[in-house]
């Protein structure tokens, strides 16, 4: 009988005769779609934080062979897989698309060709099933993923580290961000990937199928970082901005020197790759930790985060790196703060974080479009209000960091 009533309710809703809320108070449900870079993700999540269904197609193996992400190739792969991925997530959830409360999709920032695939597909669904559309800022979604798992209250400090971004910000609300600092050139994930390619780690027997960042972390476990002396970027700049291009240039010079010493040609594996990996990882970790430490000092001084029970959230693909987490744990321990990171599978791009961000926006009534005409994607997009210049003018000195063992 219950199943029969449920089916009648669904039919009534589908036919538009009554609303779900008229029948029974069901939790709202959002379908999230992610195609900003090289992962095609979809998930169905309800407002209780239950992941009803999810699916992901990763393009990593293909891009490893081409030596990096080629936008046209990524676009083609998204087109080939998006229908299958979305259908798999919906099927796993056990619900009908008519039961969705809204459809949320990444529209910024990212690779334009890839964003376009997700947006076009989503708008087709929106029109077919007559659902509200929720455009999602990719980095906002990363920042709020932790709230799916932990009752983190606003405001909190967030460090977003990935292959495309490096941002320190205060999160004051679902769509309220204040940026303290960002990368002036490339992102840490991009740097680690490029170093891995320069070291030809794709040819290392222990690194088969690993991304550049994964290979660096794996080899660093057995390396001696003290063999290669690398300078921490921007040590004399008392702000919260980041720079990684100079570090990569340092590493390239070290590699060239080692190749000359060993008589090894470019493209061949050096015997000291683990040492170089350990040195690079350590330097990236210290750079991130020092800037984060300054951000904490600044925020507490200015009353931007609570003085007690304050929280640092770290998210994005690079947040999966355990050594970098350890460095940041050192900072939060000394500052009497809690460090929270989503599990690795939710740090990298996925549909769950998009669906959850859609739920949060739906609950707060922010950014929900009942008419999606004119919805568009943006390859570049800022994150909230930028006060990085105020942080620079504060010129806060930080203490040297020793990563806890």
Swiss-Prot record:
Residues 1-19 form a transit peptide. SUPFAM superfamilies: Actin-like ATPase domain (SSF53067). It catalyses: L-threonylcarbamoyladenylate + adenosine(37) in tRNA = N(6)-L-threonylcarbamoyladenosine(37) in tRNA + AMP + H(+). InterPro entries: ATPase_NBD, Gcp-like_dom, KAE1/TsaD, TsaD. GO terms for molecular function: metal ion binding; N(6)-L-threonylcarbamoyladenine synthase activity. A divalent metal cation binds at residues 138, 142, 349. GO terms for cellular component: mitochondrion. Its cofactor is a divalent metal cation. The keyword Transferase applies. Monomer. This is tRNA N6-adenosine threonylcarbamoyltransferase, mitochondrial. The gene is osgepl1.
């Amino acid at each position: 009988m219950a199943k029969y009533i449920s089916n009648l309710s669904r039919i009534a809703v589908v036919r538009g005769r009554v609303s779900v809320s008229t029948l029974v108070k069901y939790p709202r449900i959002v379908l999230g779609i992610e195609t900003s870079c090289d992962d095609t993700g979809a998930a169905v999540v309800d407002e209780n934080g239950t992941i009803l269904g999810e699916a992901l197609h990763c393009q990593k193996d293909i891009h490893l062979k081409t030596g990096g992400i080629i936008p046209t190739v990524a676009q083609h792969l998204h087109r080939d897989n998006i229908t299958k991925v979305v259908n798999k997530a919906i099927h796993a959830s056990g619900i009908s698309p008519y039961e969705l409360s809204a459809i949320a999709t990444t529209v910024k920032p990212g690779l334009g060709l890839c964003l376009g695939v997700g947006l076009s597909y989503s708008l087709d669904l929106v029109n077919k099933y007559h659902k509200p559309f929720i455009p999602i800022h990719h980095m906002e979604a990363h920042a709020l993923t932790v709230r799916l798992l932990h009752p983190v209250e606003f405001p909190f400090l967030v460090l977003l580290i990935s292959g495309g971004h490096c941002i320190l910000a205060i999160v004051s609300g679902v769509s309220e961000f204040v940026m303290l600092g960002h990368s002036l050139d490339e992102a840490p994930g991009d740097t680690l990937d490029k170093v891995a390619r320069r070291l030809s780690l794709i040819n290392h027997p222990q690194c088969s199928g690993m991304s550049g960042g994964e290979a660096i972390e794996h080899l660093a476990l057995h390396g001696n970082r003290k063999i290669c002396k690398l300078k921490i970027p921007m040590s004399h700049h008392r702000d919260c901005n980041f720079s990684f291009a100079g570090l990569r240039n340092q590493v390239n010079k070290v590699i060239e020197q080692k190749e000359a010493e060993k008589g090894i040609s470019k493209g061949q594996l050096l015997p000291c790759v683990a040492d170089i990996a350990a040195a690079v990882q350590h330097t990236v970790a210290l750079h991130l930790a020092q800037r984060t430490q300054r951000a904490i000092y600044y925020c507490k001084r200015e009353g931007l985060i609570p003085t007690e029970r304050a929280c640092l959230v770290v998210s994005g693909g690079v947040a999966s790196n355990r050594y970098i987490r350890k460095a940041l744990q050192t900072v939060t321990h000394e500052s009497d703060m809690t460090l929270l990171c989503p599990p690795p599978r939710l740090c990298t791009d996925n549909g769950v974080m998009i669906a959850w961000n859609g739920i949060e926006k739906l609950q707060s009534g922010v950014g929900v479009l009942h008419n999606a005409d004119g919805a568009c994607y943006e390859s570049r997009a800022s994150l909230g209000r930028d006060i990085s210049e105020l942080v620079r003018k504060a010129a806060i000195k930080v203490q040297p960091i020793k990563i806890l063992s």
